Regions:
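Non-catalytic, solvent-exposed segments at the cell envelope interface
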Residues: 2-380
Length: 380
């Protein structure tokens, strides 16, 4: 059942990513792609896998290729730390911003993982970066990509900006080295959802959209403020096949008046349900055994990614993580709060216990840490 199917005429349909929480976008794209690639490779569709690998963008995200550093050529072994950064499409002359910053930590066995977000507004010390002429200083974390991307006399380099962002995240978390990194362009990801034919989700209770009409167009703001007016898209209780814009709209909802009694906690739960539904759909026989659909999904996914695996391709990582499945990925929430200075918002900061989390990550003791700190787990 496709609920609230969008029409073709009338108002121009806004971007489906408008207002969607960035962590959900990143996790959906890269997590589903990795598991999808491993499943495809295992069933032996070599030609399509090669086509996908050719579509994935490649760049020197860590700044060591130009220096002649030897790339990693041994088999992929855990533990692994992968930095995932989501960006929106921008003009070539505009400085890039890291709209979402996430770390995927995979223990030695390569069959489970922990995924956590770094708040883009986290107020941090950004280290000096000679390549971009940046002397270092305190700012919000997402600004590191902009500072690092500056190239004298040329358009900004997103890959070079990623390098400074990676150094900044390492200084915060204590991670010595990232084993891989990816830049995910949200602009093209809707094609993946369309190519898959929608996503099946089990909706726990009826939810009404704050933002969309049943045809997918935006509801209008009430004159003078006070919310939106017009008919709402409705997501009925039970198993539903949702189009891309519908699934993304559903995971935005957080108001009790619209059927989400636990507010933002409920929204986070719905987001994680969506992530796992996407990953499961990517591995379904309907996708993997359908050459036409498979080709469309692979090409759309490839066009949304720029990847650097320090000598290993995204296919190599997909195969190395072949035992990693949606149920084995633990979603982590890092508690924090806002910093106010003279009544002005400066950014976010972590609670002290987050440093203990980072130490447990370095010591490979996250399971023990989470037993003692269950509030760090995003339950689904």
């Amino acid at each position: 059942m496709i609920v609230g199917k969008a029409g073709k005429g009338g108002k121009k349909k806004p971007s489906v990513w408008a207002g969607v929480p960035r962590w959900a976008q990143v996790c959906t794209v890269f997590g589903a792609v990795l598991m999808f690639v491993s499943g495809v490779a295992l069933v032996g569709v070599e030609a399509l896998v090669a086509r996908y690998e050719g579509a994935v963008g490649k760049a020197d995200l860590f700044g060591d290729q130009a220096a002649g550093a030897s790339e990693r050529t041994s088999d992929i072994k855990g533990p692994l730390n992968i930095l995932l950064v989501g960006v929106d499409p921008r003009k070539e002359e505009q400085l890039p911003l890291a709209d979402s910053i996430m770390v995927l930590h995979v223990p030695e066995g390569l069959d489970q993982a922990y995924l956590f977000s770094m708040p883009r507004d986290l107020y941090v010390e950004i280290p000096a970066f000679d390549k971009a002429g940046f002397r270092g200083g305190a700012d919000k974390l997402n600004a590191a990509m902009s500072y690092g991307s500056r190239v004298a006399g040329e358009n900004p380099s997103t890959a070079q900006g990623f390098e400074l962002l990676a150094k900044t995240v390492q200084s915060i978390t204590g991670i010595q080295r990232f084993d891989a990194g990816a830049i995910i362009n949200f602009g093209g990801f809707i094609n993946i959802v369309d190519a898959m034919g929608g996503v099946t989700m089990d909706i726990e209770r009826e939810v009404r959209s704050e933002h969309r009409h049943p045809d997918g167009t935006h509801r209008e703001l009430r004159p003078g403020g006070g919310g939106y007016v017009g008919e709402q898209a409705v997501y009925p209780e039970g198993e539903q096949l949702l189009e891309g814009w519908q699934a993304l709209d559903y995971v935005r909802q957080r108001y009790p008046k619209n059927g989400v009694p636990d507010g933002d906690y409920g929204r986070q739960r719905h987001q994680q349900q969506f992530v796992k539904a996407m990953a499961s759909q990517a591995l379904s026989a309907d996708v993997v055994t359908n050459p036409i659909k498979l080709d469309s999904v692979l090409r759309a996914a490839g066009e949304s990614l720029v990847f650097n695996g320090r000598g290993h391709s995204v296919i190599d990582f997909g195969l190395a993580l072949k035992d990693l499945r949606p149920g084995n990925i633990q979603m982590i929430k890092l508690p924090g709060g806002g910093i106010m200075d003279g009544g002005q918002y400066r950014g976010e900061r972590f609670e002290p216990a987050v440093q203990d989390f980072f130490q447990a990550l370095q010591d490979e003791q996250l399971d023990a840490f989470l037993l003692e700190h269950p509030d760090f787990q995003n339950k689904i």
